[in-house]
Amino acid sequence: MTIQEKIQNKKTYLGIEFGSTRIKAVLIDDTFAPVASGSHDWQNRYENGVWTYSLDDITTGLQHCYASLAEDVKSKYGVVPTGYGAMGISGMMHGYMAFDKDDNLLVPFRTWRNTITEPAASELSELLGFNIPQRWSIAHLYQAVLNGEEHVKDIAHINTLAGFIHYQLTGKRQVGVGEASGIFPVDGIGYNAEYIAKADKLLADKGFSGKLLEVLPGVLNAGAREAVLTCLLYTSPSPRDA
């Protein structure tokens, strides 16, 4: 089977990584050989004491990265992908994206680069007997609770950048177990149940009404097939229009 036939028969596999300074897309075939690639440069910004990327940065960046990949495929093989055998998203891990019940982002995305959660990280680490770095999502959530931030009362769910993109593409609030390990401690194939119970009590004692297993994204094993694309990424402008 030629590369063109593999592309047309969805025998290729797409990976997209949201790095700190570049969004990268790589297409491989069923022998793991690289087929095509694309990229989009971006930068975080420091706003109101927080390192962040806007939702427009995220959406536009993904569009342009994917358009760059599609253009590379077309220029090399004369075809345009209409689907893939599988795909995966990665995105710097950690960080904090908090949403209300209508999926509105409540505060600007807080990236892994922020070091504003030391009190929360220290208290959680002592409570659980497990090191919780400042960049983890649970540290950001608990710090927001400790700070008495206005948005906390409206939180329906939180996510990482990769988890957010996964939700946008599939409608599923799920992350792989590797991604989950930067949200909250994992044990086997899910969040550590003992730690969840302890953290839930701590949060409730501080006035947080949510339950972590309802607020955090679900956890999937590596290779699990639990979601499909509801669209072919986003409508993709030409990278020349960026």
Where is each model-derived feature located?
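N-terminal glycine/serine-rich phosphate-binding loop of ATP-dependent small-molecule kinases
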Residues: 1-107, 122, 154, 210-217
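Gly/Ser/Thr-rich active-site cleft segment
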Residues: 18-20, 129-236, 240
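Short, charged, surface-exposed secondary-structure boundary motifs
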Residues: 47-49, 120-123, 185, 229
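Solvent-exposed alpha-helix faces
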Residues: 67, 240-241
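Acidic, His- and aromatic-enriched active-site or binding-groove loops in soluble protein domains
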Residues: 110
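Carbohydrate-associated surface elements
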Residues: 114
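Gly/Ser-rich phosphate-binding catalytic loop and adjacent alpha/beta segment
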Residues: 117
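Active-site neighborhood of divalent metal-dependent phosphoester bond hydrolases
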Residues: 123-129
